[in-house]
């Protein structure tokens, strides 16, 4: 009986540690927040890049139209602006292509996620095992108390 009480005491001592250990939950929330932030940010950045592409494209069209009608040094300046805008458009297109590339998580991050999932599964297994042990000990105690009570009734000749 003392052994069971000490086991229950040990389990009760571990309960606050198990209940108050929020690291797994907090890490999951941080990961979800970062993922949402990156997705939202990337969407807005891609939209801005498309707007820049449209603006640069329209400028290029306007510059090419102006350079066709221009004369003298103004035409040279427009030609130079046209090449610079073309380079800018190429840079924006390269940046868009780079933004579209799916980034995979690093192996270290994947290993950390796997380890976290394993720790969580182990924690849940241990928790379930602890619950079963406590429940079994309570059932055993109920049976012992019922036996003791029935023995006491027999000894005292009390009718049920």
Curated annotation (Swiss-Prot):
InterPro entries: Bloc1s5. GO terms for cellular component: BLOC-1 complex; transport vesicle. Belongs to the BLOC1S5 family. Component of the biogenesis of lysosome-related organelles complex-1 (BLOC-1) involved in pigment granule biogenesis. Component of the biogenesis of lysosome-related organelles complex-1 (BLOC-1) composed of Blos1, Blos2, Blos3, Blos4, Dysb, Muted, Pldn and Snapin. This is Biogenesis of lysosome-related organelles complex 1 subunit 5.
């Amino acid at each position: 009986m003392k052994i069971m009480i000490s086991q229950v005491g040990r389990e009760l001592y571990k309960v606050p540690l198990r209940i108050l250990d929020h690291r797994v939950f907090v890490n999951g929330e941080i990961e979800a927040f970062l993922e949402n932030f990156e997705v939202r940010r990337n969407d807005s950045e891609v939209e801005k890049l498309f707007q820049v592409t449209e603006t640069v494209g329209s400028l290029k069209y306007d510059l090419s139209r102006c350079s066709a009608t221009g004369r003298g040094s103004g035409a040279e300046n427009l030609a130079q602006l046209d090449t610079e805008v073309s380079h800018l458009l190429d840079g924006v297109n390269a940046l868009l292509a780079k933004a579209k590339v799916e980034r995979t998580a690093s192996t270290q991050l994947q290993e950390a996620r796997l380890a976290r999932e394993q720790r969580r599964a182990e924690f849940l297994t241990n928790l379930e095992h602890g619950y079963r042990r406590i429940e079994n000990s309570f059932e055993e105690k109920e049976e012992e108390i019922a036996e003791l009570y029935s023995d006491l009734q027999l000894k005292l000749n009390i009718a049920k």
